Amino acid sequence: MSFSVDVLANIAIELQRGIGHQDRFQRLITTLRQVLECDASALLRYDSRQFIPLAIDGLAKDVLGRRFALEGHPRLEAIARAGDVVRFPADSELPDPYDGLIPGQESLKVHACVGLPLFVGQNLIGALTLDGMQPDQFDVFSDEELRLIAALAAGALSNALLIEQLESQNMLPGDATPFEAVKQTQMIGLSPGMTQLKKEIEIVAASDLNVLISGETGTGKELVAKAIHEASPRAVNPLVYLNCAALPESVAESELFGHVKGAFTGAISNRSGKFEMADNGTLFLDEIGELSLALQAKLLRVLQYGDIQRVGDDRSLRVDVRVLAATNRDLREEVLAGRFRADLFHRLSVFPLSVPPLRERGDDVILLAGYFCEQCRLRQGLSRVVLSAGARNLLQHYSFPGNVRELEHAIHRAVVLARATRNGDEVILEAQHFAFPEVTLPPPEAAAVPVVKQNLREATEAFQRETIRQALAQNHHNWAACARMLETDVANLHRLAKRLGLKD
């Protein structure tokens, strides 16, 4: 069945009801999935020859963490190259990027696929993808109808990108709450902790303040530093990295400030230090808590006065460097213990950032797992790498003391193990491919068998009644929102509620 102007109007209304970009995007694709009766839909942003999922419906959650490079996904490349609706036949030789990523149908391949490139003028900004398990699922919809859908989606995405651009240039009126970022590609995560961290990165990036980034080993502190630099006015200049923990005391001063020829044995020529290399840019000092007190004093002088002295040189050099420092230690405790200078701590922690451990990030672990699965797929030349339901359950219940780095290594190892036990270039990661110690999984919910006191019809109606009551409570008795949650038509929901005695 085709859709009417009323359907398009309802889609537009849903977009206006959304609070923030993410909510609008989710409402858009959820509504589209219902209207077009497809098995899965996704809104993707285009950036640097890759598609980045912004919102999905009907797909495994880890899709949100994947980055679909065009070189590895010929269907998406065909969509990017097209200027119009793209329909892929059921017998298309081009693999579908979502094969194995529709929950409950991991072993089946997508049969119907439509791609809608999204443009602003002549510029590609994203795509809508619609997938179904039936070969002729989208034949009833004309290209013209699908173009109208694409126009609505392109408008929503274009507005979000424009708002983000204006906000970054401080051109939005008033003191509105910052919009959530659309262009963040590296900082994967939708948990409250990561959402707050992204907002703080946007705020501090625009300034020239020194930043102290704290967090456990493997949480991604270097990625935070990179995000700050790339969003700052210094982004056109270098970001220089130095791991303080790997610096032998004998060469640490030379690494930081450079040396002149003959300053010490082996100094056969003049050499610039990291501060000179980072002039007009950013210097990232990782594991700064490992620096000796003597070097801390010299670093403090640079932060105070902006000049350095090469080892063996009496002359001072002016440098303009923003310092981002990271540590997995509690520097306040280090100050109290006399192992870190209090004055340096206060100089560095003008704007402190804390990176949450993976165990506190909820479903972010699944998004990150999807990202690493896609990386493995590309590096090893596989057609697909997907997580089984059991593997996802295991990842969600493991504490990951090594944080994101441990997850990355675990995914890479699991892919190698799974590939060794399976022929072909399709890999499904099962729970047994992960070697996590002492993971206690919750027992199955259906452990107890209830005593039957109703016939099947009464039991079904009781279940429907309670489900609708709970959905209404969660949506503040908004019937339209309740229908979206239950994935049903609002008119059908009203009729069912009347039959069940929930409405007059």
From Swiss-Prot:
Pfam families (UniProt xref): GAF, Sigma54_activat
Key words of the record: ATP-binding, DNA-binding, Nucleotide-binding, Phosphoprotein, Transcription, Transcription regulation
GO annotation terms (biological process): phosphorelay signal transduction system
Presence of the UniProt keyword Nucleotidyltransferase in the record: no
SUPFAM superfamilies reported for this sequence: GAF domain-like, Homeodomain-like, P-loop containing nucleoside triphosphate hydrolases
Chain positions recorded as ATP binding sites: 215-222, 278-287
UniProt cross-references to InterPro entries, sorted A to Z: AAA+_ATPase, GAF, GAF-like_dom_sf, Homeodomain-like_sf, NorR, P-loop_NTPase, Sigma_54_int, Sigma_54_int_dom_ATP-bd_1
Keyword DNA-binding attributed: yes
Record feature DNA-binding region, as residue ranges: 479-498
Pathway: Nitrogen metabolism; nitric oxide reduction
Gene3D superfamilies: 1.10.8.60, 3.30.450.40, Homeodomain-like, P-loop containing nucleotide triphosphate hydrolases
Disulfide bonds: none
Domain Sigma-54 factor interaction: 187-416
Modified residues (4-aspartylphosphate): D57
Gene Ontology MF terms: ATP binding; ATP hydrolysis activity; DNA binding; DNA-binding transcription factor activity
PROSITE patterns: SIGMA54_INTERACT_1, SIGMA54_INTERACT_2, SIGMA54_INTERACT_3, SIGMA54_INTERACT_4
Membrane-traversing stretches: none
Signal sequence segment: none
Function as written in the Swiss-Prot or TrEMBL entry: Required for the expression of anaerobic nitric oxide (NO) reductase, acts as a transcriptional activator for at least the norVW operon. Activation also requires sigma-54.
Annotated protein name in UniProt: Anaerobic nitric oxide reductase transcription regulator NorR
